[in-house]
A protein has these predicted regions:
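C-terminal catalytic lobe of FAD-dependent flavoproteins
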Residues: 63, 106, 196, 200, ...
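Dinucleotide-binding Rossmann-like beta1-alpha1 core, especially the glycine-rich loop
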Residues: 1-74, 78, 202-203
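Glycine-rich, N-terminal phosphate-binding loop of Rossmann-like dinucleotide-binding domains
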Residues: 44, 152-153, 285
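Short Fe-S-cluster ligation motifs
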Residues: 378-394, 411-435
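Flavin-dependent oxidoreductases
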Residues: 127-216, 220-231, 240, 246-249, ...
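Helical element adjacent to the flavin cofactor pocket in flavoenzyme catalytic cores
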Residues: 90-147, 155
């Protein structure tokens, strides 16, 4: 997000603009995909033009650069897929797209390189401040810490309210999406929004950095803090509203659908800083859209607050860069041949839809904070993200995971925890019955 939508003067507006400005440099330093494609907010009716003008003025006050209200041929020149009957649009040339998985993994790997230790699939059950430090009770034991940073998403209010005198409330707001095949990839060049409402920015149509088209989301307040299931009603709503601003959207090219949750705080504002009535307990709560765009600025802000409170010094040995996984399909033929001669695993295609090699999958597993599940591999190198959604490559990826992790195939999970994909090996089961 460029930063034109958040209320002027809010922390959300400030950090959105700052984060968006930092993202290109961060993409270079941490080697993740970033594309400055620009965004449009489309006004279909003259009666709504005042709303578009207010959005434009709001963006100017927020410090968003290059904003322009466009019409007619100028609008069609920027994005030919916008409906010809569109009255006007707000053009934000600083709008951009990234892969959320790519950014998250890049940050995690860089953190690991700088000494951060990760403990996954662990739930906090209690928090106590005693002896000048925090005792964090989890379902896997006790952790002692000088400070706690609460970035628990839809659970951030639960942890905050365990310790703070000032309570907060977060509502999980579900958004359902559809993803279109690469074959539809050229349908739009820009991220096309509809005029926003109090629930969000409407159903967008946007390219992804990997060449797909993404359509969504809905905005439904729910009670389930983990409720990421899709629904027929939600997907029908996406389908109905998707082509309001664009014409001829090829929805027959949908290859998957999914849902995510926004951690909506009642005041619709980021809560960042020390929690009231606590010592060294810090919140990053209510981080909903534009949270992804704001992430670099949020990270900087909370690190500065914590450093000041704890009198921390800068790490002189900090490693600021990270090299991502080599993508064979992005190399020239000569470069591919050199790499394959060095490591033959890069000559074996495992995921045909996305042209992902065994070498890339092995790298994803062996790296710091490496993949430990089918989804872990998928989110790092996209094996299983293509047209067949893992129908052909899942078993092969599982075999590579089992080999690299020295684990049984039956222990490989879809996404960690107890999400096992098979109950046992057929040959072993047959032999067991033969001995009865």
């Amino acid at each position: 997000h460029a930063g034109f939508d958040a209320p002027t003067g809010s922390l959300m507006a400030k950090l959105n603009v700052e984060g968006s400005r930092v993202m290109p440099r961060l993409a270079k330093e941490l080697d993740f995909s970033y594309m400055n494609n620009g965004s449009l907010v489309v006004c279909m009716d003259e009666a709504d033009y005042a709303k578009l003008e207010r959005l434009y003025q709001n963006g100017l006050k927020n410090g968003v650069e290059g904003l322009e209200i466009v019409r007619g041929e100028r609008l069609r020149e920027i994005e030919p897929a916008v409906r010809r009957e569109a009255y006007a649009a707000l053009w934000a040339p600083t709008g951009a797209i990234i892969c959320p998985f790519g950014l998250t993994v890049a940050l995690a790997e860089n953190a690991a390189a700088n000494g951060v230790e990760f403990i996954f699939n662990t739930a906090v059950t209690a928090l106590r401040h005693e002896g000048g430090a925090w005792s964090v009770q989890t379902d896997k034991g006790l952790i002692r810490a000088n400070a706690v940073i609460n970035a628990a998403g839809t659970y951030a209010d639960v942890l905050h309210n365990m310790v703070s005198t000032k309570k907060i409330h977060i509502t999980p707001r579900k958004g359902e999406y559809m993803l279109l095949d690469h074959a539809a990839g050229g349908f739009v060049k820009r991220t096309v929004f509809q005029l926003p409402t109090k629930l969000g920015k409407g159903v967008l149509v946007s390219p992804t950095v990997h060449g797909n088209i993404i359509v969504g989301p809905t905005a439904e307040d729910i009670f389930d803090r983990d409720g990421v299931n899709t629904t027929q009603a939600g997907l029908d709503a996406v389908r109905t509203r998707a082509d309001i601003a664009v014409e001829g959207l090829p929805l027959k090219q949908v290859i998957t659908s999914f849902a995510g949750l926004r951690a909506h705080e009642d005041g619709h504002e980021f809560i960042i800083g020390r929690a009231e009535g606590t010592e060294n307990f810090f919140d990053c709560a209510g981080i909903e859209s534009p949270g992804l765009s704001s992430a670099p600025a949020i990270g900087r802000m909370i690190s500065e607050i914590v450093a000041e409170e704890l009198k921390l010094e800068k790490n002189a040995a900090f490693i600021p860069t990270r090299k991502g996984i080599t993508e064979l399909k992005k190399l020239s033929i000569d470069e591919q041949n050199v790499l394959i001669r060095q490591n033959s695993a890069y000559g074996r295609i495992v995921c045909r839809c996305e042209s992902i090699t065994e070498g890339e999958i092995v790298d994803a597993i062996r790296r710091p904070v490496g993949a430990r599940s089918l989804d872990g591999v998928k989110r790092r190198v996209r094996a299983g993200m293509g047209r067949c959604q893992g129908g052909f490559c899942s078993t092969r990826v599982m075999e590579i995971l089992a080999r690299e992790l020295k684990a049984s195939l039956a222990d490989i999970t879809k996404s960690g925890g107890e999400a096992k994909l098979i109950t046992g090996l057929a040959k072993q089961e047959a032999e067991k019955y033969e001995t009865i």
